[in-house]
Structures are given as structure tokens and as C-alpha cells.
């Protein structure tokens, strides 16, 4: 019957039947070799599988717990740091260190520091954070309100210090061209708009017909101290045959100063001391060296004084010669008088000797007669 059944099976069914039989035989051999209990391998497999599941579950839960703990820690750190940053920000914002405290101005000479600070529109105790973003605005305000400033830079540090650097092109005075007053800047540029009545705050520059001469003069003039510049009322360019770049200063205190273009800036800083030492108003010559003389002193007067001084010196020399001659004659007369006295005394002495000798002779003769 089996043969008949096998013959009736299809090839695929035969293969499956043989494969199942082989697998059963292998399983039986393995079960006999491992244990006597046929159910033990399955139980151990189940236990192992269960243990593996438990272990994997424990590891998974531990990992999940650890990840949750780390995420909570990270979240706490993030929230804490955010709160600290916010607290520091508000603490800094409302404290004095967030405010402008100090100012420093450099580069100004004619424009006062107080005027610059007023026009820059920055005040003490302004918030640094908002002021830093307005540096360009402050610079524009300063340039608009001060025409004497050519360039300006405003920098604000987080320490509360404001640094202002300016480059001046201030009005130095008025130059006369064709009997008309024009404002002249520090760089030598002349403002085209004329002025009918110049301000007394600035000096007047005369006879500067060439712009190159005017620029050269203003370059040196700007180096003088403000105190000396404020004392200048007028400057004339008055060259001579010998001195091609002579300058004639008229000062507000009544003095007049002669100087040379190349050296007047260095020498004029000593003018206050020279003026204070003068007993009366006069002339100060700074062309060669530095000396002063009274007013009304001209070259002719100087020559006359020099000739009078030479005449006085010659008369003094003549007087000295006369006195020496008189002293010599007096010495000779005294010597002759001494010699005559000695001669007279000698003659009188000889007469006395003769008389005494005559008396002795008469006495002797009388004795002989007796």
C-alpha cells in the first residue's frame, strides 16, 4: 500500500515527505544526545528567550531613563543659563556701567571742547547700547553745527567712554582783496561771500595777494598758541629789498611786531613774556633774535642815537686825554718845586757855613791881637 501511495505522489510531494522525515530524524538524534527529557530543550529555549527579552527590556528601560534624565538636565541647564543671561542683561541695563560716563576730545584748537560736546548731542548717563548705534548720527550733527570742523569721528566703548576726534578747518581771519573783506579758512581757502563789516573776533590780513603766500602764512599762523592769536589785530605782508618775507603784526595791546615768515610761529610764543617786560608800548623785532624798543623808534633815530653815542664816547676819550695831560703837568711842576726847594736849602746851608767860618776867623784874629 505504501508503494502504491508513493507511486501515486507527485515528485514535489515526495521531496517534501523525504525532507520532513530527515528533519524528524535529525531532531530525534539531537534530543537524545542533549537530554533524556524531550521537552527540556524547548523549555530551556523558552527560558533563554524569556531571559533575553527581560534583559533587553531592562536595558531598553535603563537607556530610556538615562536619555530622559539627560534631556531633563539639558533642559534645566538651558533654562537656567537663559534666566542668568536675562538677569545679567537687565542688571547691566539698569546699572551705572551701562551708561556713558567719560568724554575725551582731541584734535581741536580753535573750537572749544565745551562747544564740541554740546553739539555732538551725547550726554552723560545716556545708555551705551542705544548710543553705539547712533555714532554716525552724532558725527553728522557735529559737522552740521560746527562749520569750523572739517571731519569728525565718534567712537563709544562698552566701558562708557566716548572718544571724539576732530579735524579743524577753522576761520582764521579776514583777507582784503580789492578793498573787500573775505573770510579765510585754516587751509587757505577764501570764502567767496564778502563781508562788509568784519568781526572784531578775528584779525585782518593785508597785502596777501597770492594764495600760495597766504597758505604758507596760515600754516605757520595756526601753530601759534591761541592766547597769542587772540592778541593779534592785524597782519601786513610787508617785504623789503633785504627781507623778502617780512611780516608786520599789529597787536591788541598796542605793540607792533616785525617777524619773518619762516620763523615767526616759533618766536611769537615768547611774545607774552616780552610784552610783560616792556615798560611802555613799542616795537618788538623778531627778525634776527628778539629785542624791543620804544614806540616812534625809526632807523633814522637809531642812526642818530648811534652817532650821538659815538660822539659822546669820543668826547669822553678827549676828556680822559686832557685829564691825563693835566696830571702829567702837575707831576712835573711838583718835581721842579721840589728841586728848587732842595737848591735853596743847600744855598742857605752854605751861607750859614760861610758866616760861621768868618766868625771863627774874627775870633781868632782878636785872640792873636790880644
From Swiss-Prot:
Keyword Membrane: yes
Mode of membrane association: Single-pass type II membrane protein
Biased composition (Basic residues): 25-34, 47-63
GO CC terms in record: cell division site; plasma membrane
POTRA domain: residues covered: 98-169
Residue ranges, Extracellular side: 96-370
Residue ranges with Polar residues bias: 356-370
Any single GO BP term: FtsZ-dependent cytokinesis
Main location, first listed in the record: membrane
A Pfam family this chain is assigned to: POTRA_1
Topological domain ranges for the Cytoplasmic compartment: 1-74
Domain of life: Bacteria
Disordered as annotated region, ranges: 1-65, 295-370
Localization (cell): Cell membrane
The entry's keywords: Cell cycle, Cell division, Cell membrane, Membrane, Transmembrane, Transmembrane helix
Stretches that traverse the bilayer: 75-95
Biased composition (Low complexity): 304-314, 327-342
Known function: Cell division protein that may be involved in stabilizing or promoting the assembly of the division complex.
Entry similarity comment: Belongs to the FtsQ/DivIB family. DivIB subfamily.
Protein name listed in UniProt: Cell division protein DivIB
Gene responsible for this protein: divIB
Amino acid at each position: 500500500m505504501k508503494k502504491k501511495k508513493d507511486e501515486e505522489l507527485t515528485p514535489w510531494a515526495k521531496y517534501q515527505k523525504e525532507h520532513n522525515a530527515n528533519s524528524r530524524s535529525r531532531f530525534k538524534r539531537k534530543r537524545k544526545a542533549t537530554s533524556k527529557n524531550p521537552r527540556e530543550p524547548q523549555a530551556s529555549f523558552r527560558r533563554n528567550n524569556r531571559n533575553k527579552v527581560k534583559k533587553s527590556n531592562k536595558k531598553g528601560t535603563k537607556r530610556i531613563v538615562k536619555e530622559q534624565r539627560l534631556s531633563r538636565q539639558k533642559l534645566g541647564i538651558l533654562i537656567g543659563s537663559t534666566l542668568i543671561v536675562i538677569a545679567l542683561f537687565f542688571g547691566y541695563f539698569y546699572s551705572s556701567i551701562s551708561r556713558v560716563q567719560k568724554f575725551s576730545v582731541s584734535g581741536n584748537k580753535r573750537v572749544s571742547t565745551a562747544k564740541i560736546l554740546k553739539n555732538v548731542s551725547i550726554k552723560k548717563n545716556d545708555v551705551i547700547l542705544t548710543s553705539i548705534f547712533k555714532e554716525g548720527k552724532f558725527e553728522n550733527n557735529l559737522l552740521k553745527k560746527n562749520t569750523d570742523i572739517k571731519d569728525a569721528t565718534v567712537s563709544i566703548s562698552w566701558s562708557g567712554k566716548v572718544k571724539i576726534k576732530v579735524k579743524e578747518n577753522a576761520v582764521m581771519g579776514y583777507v582784503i582783496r580789492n578793498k573787500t573783506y573775505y573770510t579765510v579758512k585754516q587751509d587757505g581757502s577764501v570764502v567767496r561771500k564778502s563781508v562788509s563789516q568784519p568781526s572784531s573776533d578775528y584779525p585782518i590780513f593785508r597785502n596777501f595777494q597770492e594764495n600760495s603766500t597766504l597758505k604758507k602764512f596760515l600754516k605757520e599762523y595756526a601753530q601759534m598758541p591761541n592766547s597769542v592769536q587772540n592778541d593779534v589785530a592785524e597782519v601786513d605782508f610787508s617785504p623789503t629789498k633785504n627781507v623778502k618775507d617780512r611780516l608786520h603784526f599789529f597787536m591788541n595791546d598796542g605793540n607792533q611786531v616785525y617777524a619773518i615768515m619762516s620763523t615767526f610761529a616759533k618766536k611769537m610764543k615768547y611774545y607774552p613774556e616780552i610784552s610783560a617786560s616792556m615798560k611802555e608800548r613799542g616795537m618788538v623785532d623778531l627778525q634776527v633774535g628778539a629785542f624791543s624798543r620804544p614806540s616812534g623808534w625809526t632807523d633814522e633815530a637809531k642812526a642818530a642815537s648811534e652817532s650821538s653815542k659815538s660822539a659822546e664816547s669820543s668826547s669822553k676819550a678827549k676828556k680822559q686825554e686832557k685829564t691825563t695831560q693835566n696830571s702829567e703837568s702837575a707831576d712835573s711842576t711838583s718835581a721842579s718845586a721840589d728841586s728848587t726847594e732842595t737848591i735853596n736849602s743847600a744855598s742857605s746851608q752854605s751861607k750859614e757855613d760861610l758866616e760861621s767860618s768868618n766868625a771863627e776867623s774874627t775870633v781868632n784874629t782878636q785872640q792873636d791881637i790880644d
